[in-house]
């Protein structure tokens, strides 16, 4: 039997390994786009010219009349301006199955009177039409920088701070956009300005060079559609030699932003490991957590097998990134979130009210995290030679710090779980009402969560115990069964009503039933 059980324990990881293992089958070639990338030639030496070209690249990348692939090419051109050897950079990091980069040089010709004296060329020929297209008159639909609304003079900034600082401010902001562009597009603008604040405070990004919200959204749209651009940026982080002692300020800032990009989209996975497993509490021995623990173990193996690119599997849209979603290990994730909201106040703002939240495990996580004995590590206890008296005093302090009120945190965010708990259309039957009254439950489910609480979104320990008892021991009052029963009753009434009412009445009933079904299904 032991051998059989061990086989099942390793099945999840072996299954994932077999799915992701190369079978040596046919390769499906994609259609590669040809994208123009422009780099500065040796004749472009004036800092004002360089900054003008940088803002020109940025403006073209936001031009909605151009194809996204070429808009991405302009962002690549902008990023390459900070590289000492752009050709080598693109050859090393820009190899991609989706695009082929064609490199053009921008040179300064003193004899030219138009296009600001610039000419686009290669070794063999000059490209007059491309030059006109690149440097010709262009209408900016929106300002690039917030400072442009105040008529800030970029040349004055250039004279004050220098070209490297101005270019660095622009490029760092492009990198900051990547933090949220792929994994949280809805929160892109807010997330961008939150991350930017640290760079504004330390003077890296001057106020006159801060992107407008429209600029941020435009760059984010290009990143979402051009995986080749994202791959180039990720390869830059992977291959950047951070052990050098002569890192430039821009390289250091890119690495700082890279810390936000690493593991983007994997917060649930990382938090489950941190709060659910690494806390090593006794609840991990529960049999209903075992399947999720095995699943998490297989995901750890997959993550480690990706090597240096593992932190970027969501950004790169690796085919396996969907496996890391918390819906694939809901019980363990729910337990971990319960532990998290107790141990880390910042996690109380984390969206836990999701459709797959296991309420029982969420409350269990909070309960064990509040327990003083669960907070003491037996391994460290032996290593540090902690005395019984010291342990007892520690338990006493932990009990006092927890407040003693036994308040439980309510799931935050996520309309589905909120509707399931607070939906007023779900009523109690006569037998349920009597049973509830015997337990001194209130009629309003909101009051059950908030009564006698000292914090927002909390319930009392007695209410939690009653909820746990109701969920585990009394099927007739189980939350899921109550919702399912109400839905069944509504459907039965709808069926009977169809024989007596006209089509308009039927439509009203259907709308009411759909709304109730959505609330019930979303909550459980």
Swiss-Prot record:
Disordered as annotated region, ranges: 489-524
Region Homomultimerization, annotated ranges: 440-461
Keyword RNA-binding: yes
Binding site for RNA: 180, 190, 195, 260, 350, 354
InterPro entries: Paramyx_ncap
Intracellular or extracellular location(s): Virion; Host cytoplasm
UniProt region (Ntail), positions on chain: 405-524
Region annotation Interaction with the phosphoprotein: where it falls in the sequence: 462-471
Biased composition (Acidic residues): 505-515
Residue ranges with Polar residues bias: 494-504
GO molecular function, one term: structural molecule activity
Gene: N
Assembly and interaction partners: Homomultimer; forms the nucleocapsid. Binds to the viral genomic RNA. N0 interacts with the phosphoprotein (via N-terminus); this interaction allows P to chaperon N0 to avoid N polymerization before encapsidation. Interacts as N-RNA template with the phosphoprotein (via C-terminus); this interaction positions the polymerase on the template.
Ncore as annotated region, ranges: 1-404
Domain notes for this protein: Ncore is globular and carries regions required for self-assembly and RNA-binding. Ntail is an intrinsically disordered monomeric domain in the C-terminus.
Database matches in Pfam families: Paramyxo_ncap
Assigned keywords, A-Z: Capsid protein, Helical capsid protein, Host cytoplasm, Ribonucleoprotein, RNA-binding, Viral nucleoprotein, Virion
Family named by the database record: Belongs to the paramyxoviruses nucleocapsid family.
Record's protein name: Nucleoprotein
One cellular component term from this protein's GO annotations in UniProt: viral nucleocapsid
Record's function text: Forms the helical nucleocapsid (NC) in a ratio of 1 N per 6 ribonucleotides, protecting the genome from nucleases. The encapsidated genomic RNA serves as template for transcription and replication; encapsidation by N is coupled to RNA synthesis. Forms the encapsidation complex with the phosphoprotein protein P. Before encapsidation, the newly synthesized free N protein, so-called N0, is chaperoned by P.
């Amino acid at each position: 039997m032991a051998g059989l059980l061990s086989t099942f324990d390793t099945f999840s990881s072996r299954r994932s390994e077999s799915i992701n293992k190369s079978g040596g089958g046919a390769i499906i070639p994609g259609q590669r786009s040809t994208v123009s990338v422009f780099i500065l030639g040796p004749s472009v030496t004036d800092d004002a010219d360089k900054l003008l070209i940088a803002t020109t690249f940025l403006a073209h990348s936001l031009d909605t009349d151009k194809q996204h692939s070429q808009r991405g090419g302009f962002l690549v051109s902008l990023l390459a301006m900070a590289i000492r050897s752009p050709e080598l950079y693109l050859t090393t990091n820009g190899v991609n199955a989706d695009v082929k980069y064609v490199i053009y040089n921008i040179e300064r010709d003193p004899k030219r009177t138009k296009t600001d004296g610039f000419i686009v060329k290669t070794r063999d020929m000059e490209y007059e039409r491309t030059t006109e297209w690149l440097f010709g008159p262009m209408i900016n639909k929106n300002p690039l920088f917030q400072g442009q609304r105040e008529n800030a003079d970029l040349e004055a900034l250039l004279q004050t701070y220098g070209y490297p600082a101005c270019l660095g401010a622009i490029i760092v902001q492009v990198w900051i956009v990547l933090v949220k562009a792929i994994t949280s597009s809805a929160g892109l603008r807010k997330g961008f300005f939150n991350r930017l604040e640290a760079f504004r405070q330390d003077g890296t990004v001057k106020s006159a060079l801060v992107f407008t919200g429209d600029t941020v959204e435009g760059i984010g749209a290009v990143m979402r559609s051009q995986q080749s651009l994202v791959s180039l940026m990720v390869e830059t982080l992977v291959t950047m030699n951070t052990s050098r002692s002569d890192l430039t300020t821009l390289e250091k800032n890119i690495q700082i932003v890279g810390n936000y990009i690493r593991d983007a989209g994997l917060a649930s996975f990382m938090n489950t490991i941190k709060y659910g497993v690494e806390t090593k509490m006794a609840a991990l021995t529960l049999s209903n957590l075992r399947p999720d623990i095995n699943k998490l173990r297989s995901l750890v193996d997959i993550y480690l097998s990706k090597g240096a690119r593992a932190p970027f599997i969501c950004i790169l849209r690796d085919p396996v990134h969907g496996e890391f979603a918390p819906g694939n290990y809901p019980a363990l994730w729910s337990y971990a979130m319960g532990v998290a909201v107790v141990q880390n106040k910042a996690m109380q703002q984390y969206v836990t009210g999701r459709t797959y939240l296991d309420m029982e495990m969420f409350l269990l996580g909070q309960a064990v995290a509040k327990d003083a004995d669960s907070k003491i590590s037996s391994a460290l206890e032996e290593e540090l030679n902690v005395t019984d008296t010291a342990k007892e005093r520690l338990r006493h302090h932990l009990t006092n710090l927890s407040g003693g009120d036994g308040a439980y945190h309510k799931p935050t965010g996520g309309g589905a779980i909120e509707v399931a708990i607070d939906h007023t259309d779900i009523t109690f039957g006569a037998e349920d009402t009597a049973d509830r009254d015997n337990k001194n439950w209130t009629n309003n489910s909101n009051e059950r969560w908030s009564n006698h609480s000292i914090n927002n979104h909390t319930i009392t320990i007695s209410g939690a115990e009653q909820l746990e008892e109701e969920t585990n021991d009394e099927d007739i009052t189980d939350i899921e069964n109550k919702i399912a029963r109400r839905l069944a009753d509504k459907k039965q009434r709808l069926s009977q009503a169809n024989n007596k009412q006209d089509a308009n009445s039927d439509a009203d009933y259907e709308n009411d039933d759909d709304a109730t079904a959505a609330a019930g299904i979303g909550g459980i």
